């Protein structure tokens, strides 16, 4: 199965603000960004899966496929009480503690990276068993990084070493018969 993991376009929010699962719209550059992304994609997808957040759903609407699915498991990391707060304001003991152990520790009223990984891999393992040839998945950088880490068996505390710009496309070629997974970045 050929799977394109596509990061959403630029969200409508100031730089330096923590936004995770906040449902943000996209900027005025959406159409131009969308057209660039679409020029890199296939035209014969069997299905499109998307995070339900607007910044993903808008892009997913532009990708042609006979089947469409919105799936909460594809949502970004939930930063809880820190959503919509400036990153540079994270000076409390809770925030310092979280930054030192973001894999296991949840943001207040949010989720840990382990919880996020479990929901993302639940989706991923289900998708790998599905009977599709070509699939597009419109999602967030956190989801892309976790799938990348899973496929390459990378420790979760290293996932932020992978830089992903808005509109980044990862292509995963999955063959369960050969137990072979390859990734390339488009």
Residue locations for each model-derived region?
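Active-site-proximal alpha-helix that buttresses catalytic centers in soluble enzyme cores
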Residues: 3-66
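Short, solvent-exposed aromatic-acidic interface loops
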Residues: 182-186
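Phosphate-handling substructures
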Residues: 63-119
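Domain-level recognition of soluble alpha/beta enzyme cores
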Residues: 155-180
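Short beta-strand scaffold positions
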Residues: 50-51, 118, 138-139
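GST superfamily/GST-like fold recognition
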Residues: 141-145, 168
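Generic beta-sheet signal
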Residues: 3-4, 131-141
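Glycine-rich phosphate-binding loop signature in dinucleotide/nucleotide-binding domains
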Residues: 41-44, 127-133
């Amino acid at each position: 199965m050929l799977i394109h993991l596509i990061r959403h376009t630029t969200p409508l929010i100031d730089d330096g603000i923590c936004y995770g699962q906040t449902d943000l719209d996209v900027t005025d550059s959406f159409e131009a960004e969308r057209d660039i992304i679409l020029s890199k994609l296939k035209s014969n997808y069997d299905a499109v899966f998307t995070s339900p957040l607007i910044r993903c759903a808008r892009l997913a609407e532009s990708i042609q496929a006979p089947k469409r699915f919105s799936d909460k498991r594809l949502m970004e990391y939930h930063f809880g009480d820190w959503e919509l707060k400036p990153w540079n304001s994270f000076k409390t003991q809770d925030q310092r503690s979280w930054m030192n152990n973001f894999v296991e520790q949840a943001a207040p009223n949010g989720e840990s990276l382990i919880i996020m990984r479990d929901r993302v891999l639940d989706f991923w393992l289900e998708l790998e068993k599905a009977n599709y040839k070509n699939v597009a998945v419109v999602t967030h950088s956190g989801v892309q990084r976790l799938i990348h880490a899973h496929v390459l068996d990378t420790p979760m505390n290293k996932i932020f070493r992978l830089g992903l710009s808005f509109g980044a496309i990862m292509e995963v070629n999955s063959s369960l018969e050969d137990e072979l997974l390859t990734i390339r970045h488009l």
